[in-house]
Amino acid sequence: SRGTQLIETRGHRLGQINALSVIHYADVEFGLPSRLTASVYQGGGDILDIERSVELGGSLHAKGVLLMSSFLKAHFGREQTLHFSAALAFEQSYGQVDGDSATVAELSALISAISQLPIDQSWAITGSMNQLGQVQPIGGVNAKIEGFFDACKLQGLTGKQGVIIPRQNMQHLMLRKDVIEAVSNGQFHIHAIDTIDQALELLMARPVGTLNKKGRYTKKSIYAAVMDQLDYWQAIEDGAEFEEEPKKKKKKKKDKKKAKAEKKTVATENTAEQTPETISTATTAD
């Protein structure tokens, strides 16, 4: 791409991920990594597929976005309305986009944007997904892996880069010799997954979390961060109660500090009044 395609193969970014596509030219196919981005904001729960909106996305791609939306609502919208909207886009994409092989990448970018947890740009990912979060096989896996490997090689291999693929596609691997050597030497990695949860844990380097009896996810987990942000949007939707609560807490803290300071002052004054009497009594005793 001679540096014209904006791709990052190191560092961490919010709502940004390396997706993989296949370009067919005559009888040849080659893989092309693409930057996929997600932006979120307070809204009514709509997910805008920009490719579809400008008639660059096909029906299979649109189906993938709907499946992703269904997964989000099933996981996080059982007890509350999702008060956010989002937009998804393949950056620097000027042709038709179809197929559902970017569904896992799109959902990962969206969860990163909501949770405010960055994605490791050392990884590229491909895979379709069903409503249950199970990852499904895709086509062109070899070309996709080789395409991202070439991009990493141009920017410099770090030993941390690699591609995340559906486990079912492992049987289809027939990679170039240089890619196989890089994998053998630990310079490049291929990781197989079965679920979206496994993908998120690799991309964000923390557990997704488990749901407890109270309907909350494990602290400091990916899904807990998602729920925290959704609760924040819910509080804003409910009105001024969210804004008043922190002020009340601050006032209580100030009142406690003031009472403590006054108590300390009274104690000091009492000590000051008692000290001369004690000295005087001691002198009389002598």
Residue ranges and their predicted role:
Residues G11-H24, F30:
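N-terminal amphipathic/basic leader segments beginning at the initiator methionine
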